[in-house]
């Protein structure tokens, strides 16, 4: 239907409400960053109009014939450079046009919602999204002139609203035989003619309006109609009515990964804040999980109209493996619906979703460890990123409780609660060791004393472990301690046969003190100190750090990332029961200082550095000392 402007009655020229000219300029040039939004907004308004009519017809059945199909149609005329958006919803009369289009931020939809809220018939509900009163004016981003022709349901007269977005508009009565509803004609800027193309329109509709309640059709120049929105908003169904096949199809459309969802979170919250979430945990790890951008993949909808998936802080970064949607009429959007405001409502939804996700993952872990291990292999490292974030103790402990770790005490992954349940009565700490791989930590000299005394140690092999262990030092009143700490004391776990009588012990201490001084003198500034190890059983030496100092692996990581430009001296622990150390002690006691002993001591220090992945200051000197010793060996 073309609009014939000559077929109108007397035109009434009006000015927009106070300061609207300035506001229009903001809307057109600053408020929206994506021009596609204009069509989303017009379709949303059309959907609102259809919703209004459906509601009003329940009170007045004469407004809507049962055979009527409420829908939205889009068409274009490339010769005239015009785009048309038509709906057969409630329509507007003269006063509606003035109130709703002549006043910015005084949306008819909001007024309608207020009327519903104040209605005594509280059982009736309606889904309306145009709460901001400015979406219509985004049309002027792409159009030089906007013409609205409308007839309100139940009324005979039709009206034409017309404006060029310059602070004025006109209203006139139309003599055209206008069907119920509203038709918007956009006279496009020449450079915006891409929006006249059917495929461009279809892309916008499927992106933003694929799930609205009413069909959106495109009518081509030959009069052929094609429905553009096709997907049902399955999250609006009761969760028990959604089939696995529907879940699989929707999951693939939002997750862009293969396979089926490993876990489904489908919930409707009807408390102080209303929202529905349909979130999936993939069974396959996405390729971009650790991309520097680390984008979340949860789409935000308001009453089934897509708003954005960018800058959505509706889930924390450490749950970014979740794919799906959150839909809420209560989500606080800025006036352009493009950027979420950081306020209390968003934070409450975020907290609720986070708590629910952690709770459901915890249930999965208890139900089937084998299945949970698959999840943990894919996403455990991401989940542990959350342990580095600032959060209340109870939330952090809830997150830590669903983490799983390798351990010296079990071939299967264990929880930290499993570990605590197996602690020895006299044990005061949860012990752990970090490393680059499971094999490397299992073979670490740091574990020898713990294994020999039956003490379980948790094995951390993800890079993120270095970070969270630097900020979390306690879990459920149990201290968490690295086995690389120099103050680790395992003597209280010794058996009776391991204890030495006081006389022998006194003699050993004198000998040990002498050798410690010699090691310290030889190594000089290369070490912070030299101590007798209380944890080594098979290896001669190892590196350690004092309590409160940076962990070995964390310091190395920061140096690699150029965040630290120096190396702190470490503690060297020596095992006085090892044959090599005994040989040095004996030789020193018999003949005192000599170059061969010094080479041996330096090589033992180099060995400890190599095992921990520490760089040597002078590789050439290491090779020289090694060659000196090898040259004295008789073959």
Curated annotation (Swiss-Prot):
Q: Where are the bilayer-spanning segments?
A: none
User: What GO molecular function annotation could you give as one example from this UniProt entry?
Assistant: ATP binding
Q: Kindly state which keywords UniProt assigns to this record, in alphabetical order.
A: ATP-binding, Chaperone, Cytoplasm, Nucleotide-binding, Stress response
The places in or outside the cell where this protein is found are:
Cytoplasm
In residue numbers, the region (C) covers: 557-635
What does UniProt give as GO cellular component?
cytoplasm
Kindly indicate whether the keyword ATP-binding belongs to this entry.
yes
Quaternary structure and partners: Homodimer.
Q: Which family does it belong to?
A: Belongs to the heat shock protein 90 family.
The protein's name in its UniProt record: Chaperone protein HtpG
- What organism is recorded for this protein? Wolbachia pipientis wMel
Q: What is the lineage of its organism?
A: Bacteria, Pseudomonadati, Pseudomonadota, Alphaproteobacteria, Rickettsiales
Q: Tell me what gene encodes this.
A: htpG
């Amino acid at each position: 239907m073309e609009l014939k402007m000559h077929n109108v009655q007397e035109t009434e020229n009006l000015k927009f409400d106070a300061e609207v000219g300035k506001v229009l300029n903001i809307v057109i040039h600053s408020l929206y960053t994506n021009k596609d939004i204009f069509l989303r907004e017009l379709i949303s308004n059309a959907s609102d109009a259809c919703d209004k009519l459906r509601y009003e017809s329940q009170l007045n059945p004469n407004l809507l014939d049962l055979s009527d199909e409420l829908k939205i149609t889009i068409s274009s005329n490339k010769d005239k450079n015009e785009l048309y958006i038509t709906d057969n919803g409630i329509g507007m009369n003269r006063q509606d046009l003035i109130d709703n289009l002549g006043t910015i931020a005084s949306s008819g939809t909001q007024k309608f919602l207020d009327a519903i809220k104040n209605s005594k018939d509280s059982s009736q509900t309606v889904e309306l999204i145009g709460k901001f009163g400015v979406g219509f004016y985004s049309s002027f981003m792409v159009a030089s002139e906007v013409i609205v022709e409308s007839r309100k349901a139940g009324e005979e007269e039709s009206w034409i609203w017309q404006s060029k977005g310059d602070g004025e508009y006109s209203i006139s009565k139309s003599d055209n035989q206008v069907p119920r509803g509203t038709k918007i004609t956009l006279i496009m800027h020449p450079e915006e003619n891409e929006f006249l193309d059917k495929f461009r329109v279809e892309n916008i509709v499927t992106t933003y309006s694929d799930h609205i309640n009413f069909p959106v059709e495109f009518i081509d120049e030959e009069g052929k109609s094609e429905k553009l929105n096709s997907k049902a908003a399955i999250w609006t169904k009761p969760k028990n009515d959604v089939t696995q096949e529907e879940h699989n199809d929707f999951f693939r459309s939002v997750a862009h990964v293969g396979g089926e969802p490993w876990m489904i979170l489908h919930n409707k919250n009807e408390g102080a804040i209303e929202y529905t979430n349909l979130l999936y945990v993939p069974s396959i790890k996405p390729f971009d999980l650790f991309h520097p951008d680390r984008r979340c993949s949860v789409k935000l909808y308001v009453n089934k109209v897509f708003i954005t998936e960018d800058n959505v802080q509706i889930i924390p970064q450490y749950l970014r493996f979740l794919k799906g949607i959150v839909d809420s009429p209560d989500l606080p959007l800025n006036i352009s619906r493009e950027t979420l405001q950081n306020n209390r409502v968003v934070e409450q939804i975020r907290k609720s979703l986070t708590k629910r996700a952690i709770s459901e993952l915890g249930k999965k872990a208890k139900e089937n460890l084998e299945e949970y291990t698959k999840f943990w292999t894919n996403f455990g490292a991401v989940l542990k990123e959350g342990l580095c974030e600032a959060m209340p103790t109870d939330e952090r402990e809830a997150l830590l409780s669903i983490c799983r770790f390798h351990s010296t005490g079990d071939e299967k992954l264990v929880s930290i609660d499993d570990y605590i349940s197996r602690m020895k009565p006299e044990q005061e700490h949860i012990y752990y060791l970090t490393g680059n791989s499971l094999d490397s930590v299992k073979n670490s000299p740091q574990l020898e004393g713990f294994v020999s005394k039956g003490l379980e140690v948790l094995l951390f092999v993800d890079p993120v472990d270095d970070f969270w262990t630097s900020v979390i030092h306690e879990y459920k009143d149990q201290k968490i301690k690295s086995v690389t700490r120099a103050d680790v004391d395992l003597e209280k776990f010794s058996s009776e046969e391991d204890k030495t009588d006081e006389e022998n012990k006194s003699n050993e201490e004198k000998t040990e003190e002498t050798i410690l001084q010699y090691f310290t003198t030889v190594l000089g500034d290369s070490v912070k100190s030299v101590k007798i190890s209380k944890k080594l059983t098979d290896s001669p030496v190892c590196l350690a750090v004092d309590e409160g100092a940076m962990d070995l692996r964390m310091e190395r990581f920061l140096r690699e990332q150029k965040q630290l430009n120096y190396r702190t001296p470490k503690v060297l622990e020596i095992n006085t029961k090892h044959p090599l150390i005994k040989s040095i002690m004996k030789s020193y006691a018999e003949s005192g200082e000599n170059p061969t002993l010094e080479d041996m001591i330096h090589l033992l220090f180099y060995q400890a550095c190599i095992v921990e992945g520490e760089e040597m200051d002078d590789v050439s000197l290491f090779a020289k000392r090694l060659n000196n010793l090898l040259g004295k060996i008789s073959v």
